[in-house]
Structure formats: structure tokens, C-alpha cells
């Protein structure tokens, strides 16, 4: 796991925003939702934005997380998606 202080800074459960930045792809949002569904099943409608040159997409999704471990494992799994450059 990651060495974070989420448990010291946040009260769980809480709504947590993830921003996933990756190569421009029509399927990036679907792949992000699929990963989130494995951890926290639910109905998600992520917002998407294309960079000014069309090179990258950013997907923002809010997830109700239950623990520090859930926040961290989502960071790890979202970063493992093919084409993802950053998870914020």
C-alpha cells in the first residue's frame, strides 16, 4: 500500500474525487468507471475534458470511499489503466 495520511486528514465514509489524466481515448471514461465499479459498485457519471491540443483526456469521478485502504487501492488500480499518465 501507499504511505499516506488520509486516515488522519479525513473522516470515513466520505465522497472523494479522483482525476485521471490519460492519452486521448473515447474509452478512457468507461475504463475508469469499470475500475471504480470493482471497488465501489454504483452508478457513476464522470465528467470528461479534452486538452486544448486534443492529446489528453481528464476524467473526474466522485466515489464514496469507506477507508484509507480503499482510497489507496483505487489510486493504484486507476494508475494501472493503459494510457493513464496521472491520477490526482
Swiss-Prot record:
A Pfam family annotated for this UniProt entry? DUF493
Gene Ontology terms, cellular component aspect?
cytosol
Membrane-spanning segments: none
PANTHER family named in the record: UPF0250 PROTEIN YBED
Family the UniProt entry places it in: Belongs to the UPF0250 family.
- The name this protein carries in UniProt is UPF0250 protein Swoo_3713
**Which species is the source of this protein?**
Shewanella woodyi (strain ATCC 51908 / MS32)
